[in-house]
Amino acid sequence: MAQFYSPNRRVTTRKAIPAKNLTVTVTSLDPFGQGVARHEGKTVFVTGVLPGEQAEVQLTEDKRQFSHAKLKRLLTHSPQRVEPQCPHFTRCGGCQQQHADITLQQSSKTAALMRLMTRETGAELPDASLIAGTPYAYRRRARLALYFQAKEQRLLMGYRQSNSHDLVDIKACPVLRPELEALLQPLRDCLSRLKAVKRLGHVELVQAENGPLLVLRHLDPLHPADEQALRDFAEQQGVSVYLAPDADSLTCLHGDEPVYLVAGLTLAFSPRDFIQVNDAVNQQMVAQALAWLDVQPQDRILDLFCGMGNFTLPLAQRAASVVGVEGVTALVEKGRENARRNALSNVTFFHQNLEDDVTQQPWVAQGFDKILLDPARAGAAGVMEQITRLAPKRVVYVSCNATTLARDSKVLLAAGFTLVNVAMLDMFPHTGHLESMALFLHDTGTRKA
């Protein structure tokens, strides 16, 4: 569902507490980049302070077991503190960790992942590996909110402030791919001249393999002069332009269907389809999944929550046959289209609610040697028991939520699988987002019927 900026939107605020200053020493970072300290036996989370740094902080929230505080003054500085590259850092809510060296960010996220997996599964785990790309200029997709400021008679374009619905009017965004960052000022200029400038919702920027594109969400039908202005902008900047008058409609005003590359394959996608934000990490993630599954020419493989085929089609290049299962009809159709585009005839896509029992489906009858799943944040609770009944030799679980990965892992471990590899995917450097993948092996001698 589309979301729009509203200056009158109610913001929930924490109950004010009496101002209280503390001096604390941070010992670690949590997965979200907050410094973790102890004071009088209680954990204190404080933004902007790194491990080893001592700081004067002010409490903003005081609970029975923990407190939150804001930084007042740094008393010592860590050698792992670096200068943020973004001029909007600390105000913009997009990034939280640009002040921390990238190796510190990655080690903190990896440690948090392993603590969670160990605590929840009770298993003896191998050291986690790291999959990462460049810390800047990585983001190939972004949504910028738009709001016309009547008092100043100017268009604001940017991201939300931290813990606020207010907009930060950005002039630069160094985590964006350079092709997208270069569009910020000319795009702002173009949109500011539209007759519909007061009735714009947001703009999405996407860097496809065949060039950048934008999706403009507008609240009223556009005047022909506005459409022509956008066509002129598209031609001048080499950009494809799509118009979105509502949450469901999409019209190409100028340009070609976007594509991206993965494992040497070309995949077409709709501008609103999900694709991984970080291309470099996606390439490595797919390669790691293929290696962990140890795909053989005789293998029959199942890909659950397959989307448009990001893993499915590279698997089909190597296996005897692959079945992709997805709950979104449009993505199933796009997966089939991409299979035809890449001349892959050994892959079949099915639309299926993965909360249902898929073990009775005809395409399950032959069984599967290996399974890959890449669910959304809610995880795959509804399908884990079905995976154990299929008893594949290998399972690769790709996760955007370590909590649900840990929960679902327990089902596999209880069924006789062994967790042999874990990787932390730094898909979103400088943010608190943590993604991961895990490999489970099953003793074929104990496979269930």
From Swiss-Prot:
The keyword Lipid metabolism does not apply. Pfam families: TRAM (PF01938), tRNA_U5-meth_tr (PF05958). S-adenosyl-L-methionine binds at Q276, F305, N310, E326, N353, D374. Residues 15-73 form the TRAM domain. It catalyses: uridine(1939) in 23S rRNA + S-adenosyl-L-methionine = 5-methyluridine(1939) in 23S rRNA + S-adenosyl-L-homocysteine + H(+). Its EC number is 2.1.1.190. The active site is at C400. One of its GO terms (biological process) is rRNA base methylation. [4Fe-4S] cluster binds at C86, C92, C95, C173. The keyword Ribosomal protein does not apply. It is an enzyme of class 2 (transferase). GO terms for molecular function: 4 iron, 4 sulfur cluster binding; iron ion binding; RNA binding; rRNA (uridine-C5-)-methyltransferase activity. Keywords: 4Fe-4S, Iron, Iron-sulfur, Metal-binding, Methyltransferase, rRNA processing, S-adenosyl-L-methionine, Transferase. CDD domains: AdoMet_MTases. It comes from the Bacteria. HAMAP family: 23SrRNA_methyltr_RlmD (MF_01010). Catalyzes the formation of 5-methyl-uridine at position 1939 (m5U1939) in 23S rRNA. Belongs to the class I-like SAM-binding methyltransferase superfamily. RNA M5U methyltransferase family. RlmD subfamily. This is 23S rRNA (uracil(1939)-C(5))-methyltransferase RlmD. It comes from Pectobacterium carotovorum subsp. carotovorum (strain PC1). The lineage of its organism: Bacteria, Pseudomonadati, Pseudomonadota, Gammaproteobacteria, Enterobacterales. The gene is rlmD.
